[in-house]
Each structure stands twice: as C-alpha cells, then as structure tokens.
Amino acid sequence: EDIKYGAIIAAPAVVLHELAHKFVAMSFGANAVLHAPSLFGIPYGMYLLVILLIHLNFPILFFVGGYVSHTALPALASSIVAFAGPLTNLILWLGGMSLIKYGLVNRKYYTNIGMMAKLNMFFFIFNMIPLPGFDGFNVFFGLVQAFL
C-alpha cells in the first residue's frame, strides 16, 4: 500500500515536470518528443515493470520518468526549456505548502498535500543540481552561452 501511495503522489510531479519541458519547447517553435523509458526494447516497458513490481509488493522500486528531446533552440530558449520542469516542481511545492499554511483545504488532506509538496521540493532541488545530466546543468550552460 505504501508503494501505491508513493506512486500516486509521485506520478503527477514527474509527468507534469516532463510535460512542462515539452510544451515550453513547443512554445519556442521546437519539435518536442516525450520519451517514455523502454525496457529491453519494449516501449513503456519501465512503466509496466514498475506496475508489476507494485502489484507483487516488491520492497524496492526505482523509476525513470522519461525525458523530452527537442530540436535545436537558441541558448536562452534552451535554458528556459530546461528550467520549465523544475519550475513546475517549485510551483507544486510552494502551492502545496501554501494550501496548508493558509488553511485553504480540509485538514484531512494535509498529510497527502504535505507529502506531495515535500516530494516536489526534492524534485526541484535534485533537478537543479548543475551537473551534466541534470536540468540545472542545462539551465546554467544555456545562460552561460546566452550571456557570455
């Protein structure tokens, strides 16, 4: 049950993060494709594996949400596209915390919203690490290219 709960809390954070990359890239006129992770060449295979492991009550799960590839864009636009995903997580984090802080939702939802907010905080911070392979690197690299 804990794994199912975790998946329900995490899925919107991952999906909205990737869709933000896609739609922002498209807004700059790029062709953008959301790639779901495959497993042994099976499209969406990683998702199928996660669902299977959840139903088998497997104690340890890993998950790769996917990634977006897009056609070439100017450096600043690429930086903005890279920031779109983490920005979505930042908005979900601060939005969730605000719902609780200002009592805008029923108290019975505080735990779920708090978990969602903390997960999005983690996704935001983790994705903004300025190392290759992370969105933070692409944000930083795009800004350096655009302004230096």
Which ranges hold each PLM region?
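Hydrophobic transmembrane alpha-helices and their immediate loop junctions
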Residues: 1-148
